[in-house]
């Protein structure tokens, strides 16, 4: 395997895929990225066996096709510290030989692990398919993920519950998260193709990785899922994840119905007031008391 690519192009792709690699791995191959050079380009893959990220890298000149693995964190840090305008050459003759990286007057060698040891996270059939705009996906995540539980014993709360339902006579795609103390719920119009989807719990790590990738995307994001796995396609990047195997609680039972105590406040002014008052709290939970009067709201 031998190819040449602009440092900026390679760095961007490495940043996307190496992010899923766990820093402390008991399985050595999971600390590596799979590099596959072939006619037409380069493909990078990283996985922790729960999530897999695959990216097709453009603008690569392939002199010799081949496959190898390389330590994700080391490769990323080397490329990150190269000059912005550098051309990066990666050369691996095959077998157990080391991977050579060259850029201008700099060169180094990296140990590799056998390609056959790199795990494949087979997707199986993903029968339910639909698309969301990048803005819709960002909103579903941003307005719910703060409520995801971090308590590992309640594993079924360690993600966002996504399902198709009805609200006010309209069909919607709803995202819900709760940690048992707070609950966040947000809806988008139901995309075409999502009507028959099962309710699924997308894990917290997947949500965080997906949100980072969605920040760079403006086009539609394709979603494909089964009751055990979900795949998001964001341009040249594919993120595939296992789903949490559990039953999300009947959250609607804890939402008050017919509540006539409704208050509307200016969002920015309220957020700024909460931040100022919470700043002087010494308690870990940083509580803020709301005193509500006629046409007034006092925070203390």
Language model features with spans:
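Structural preference for solvent-exposed beta-strand-turn elements
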Residues: 1-300
């Amino acid at each position: 395997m031998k190819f040449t690519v602009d440092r900026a192009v390679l760095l961007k792709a490495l940043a996307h895929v190496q992010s899923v690699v766990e820093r402390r791995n008991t399985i050595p191959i999971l600390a590596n990225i799979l590099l596959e050079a072939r006619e037409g380009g380069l493909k990078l893959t990283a996985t922790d066996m729960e999530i897999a990220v695959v990216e097709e890298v453009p603008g690569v000149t392939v002199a010799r096709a081949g496959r190898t693995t390389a330590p994700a964190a080391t490769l990323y840090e080397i490329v990150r510290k190269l000059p912005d305008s550098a051309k990066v050459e990666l050369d691996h003759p095959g077998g157990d030989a080391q991977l050579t990286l060259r850029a201008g007057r700099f060169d180094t060698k990296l140990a590799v692990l056998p390609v056959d040891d790199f795990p494949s996270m087979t997707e199986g059939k993903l029968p339910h398919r639909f698309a969301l705009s990048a803005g819709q996906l960002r909103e579903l995540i941003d307005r719910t993920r703060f409520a995801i539980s971090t308590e590992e014993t309640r594993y079924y709360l360690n993600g966002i519950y996504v399902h198709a339902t009805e609200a006010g006579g309209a069909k919607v795609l709803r995202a819900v998260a709760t940690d048992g103390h707070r609950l966040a719920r947000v809806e988008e119009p139901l995309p075409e193709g999502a009507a028959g989807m099962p309710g699924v719990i997308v894990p917290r790590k997947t949500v965080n990785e997906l949100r980072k990738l969605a920040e760079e995307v403006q086009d539609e994001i394709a979603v494909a899922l089964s009751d055990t796995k979900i795949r998001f396609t964001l341009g040249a990047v594919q993120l595939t994840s296992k789903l949490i195997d559990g039953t999300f609680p009947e959250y609607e039972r804890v939402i008050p119905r017919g509540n006539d105590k409704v208050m509307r406040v200016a969002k920015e002014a309220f957020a700024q007031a909460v931040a100022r008052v919470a700043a002087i709290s010494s308690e870990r939970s940083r509580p803020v008391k709301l005193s509500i009067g006629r046409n007034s709201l006092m925070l203390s």
